Amino acid sequence: MSVQCKEIQYGVYGRCLEMSNKLCRLVVTLDKGPHIICYQLHGEPNVMHEDREDATTQKGPDFDNYFYPGAVWHIYGGHRLWLSPESMPETYYPDNFAVPYTVEGNTITLTPKEQEGNHVQLVFRITLEENGTKATIAHTIYNRDTAPKTFAPWGLSVLAPGGVEIVPQADKPTGLL
């Protein structure tokens, strides 16, 4: 079985894209985000946190003024791309909009619209192994402003209680992280 990609409805998250092979699946939000809201081996629980009750949000005058009136940030859960250093409200972008995507083989590319207020555009490129459980996520941030910006990309994963994430580290003795 090669990698299969199809649109599905996934709980409170609405329209999502499911990528799967014979061993695992991941689900990416399309009505908002993008967030990798589910990663699981077949027959096993999702290792990602899902804020199905919408318990973690941020809003208020700072959000209205910086982003747009009525802006509300939701954690949603799962894996997302964040700007660092963390700053309120700038890094709490309310990513509540539909996400365009393309599928090419075992890779999906998700390109949400430019962030209002921040003037950056995030791009996710997710590749799922055809015969394994490894998902490779490449993040790109484009500065769409006329002025330079100083920030770092932060791939942030919110895991379910007891979840374990393995993150590769540098294998050369540089004396740095």
Language-model-derived ranges and their functions:
Residues M1-T136, Y142-L177:
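Surface-exposed acidic/polar loop and edge beta-strand patches at domain peripheries
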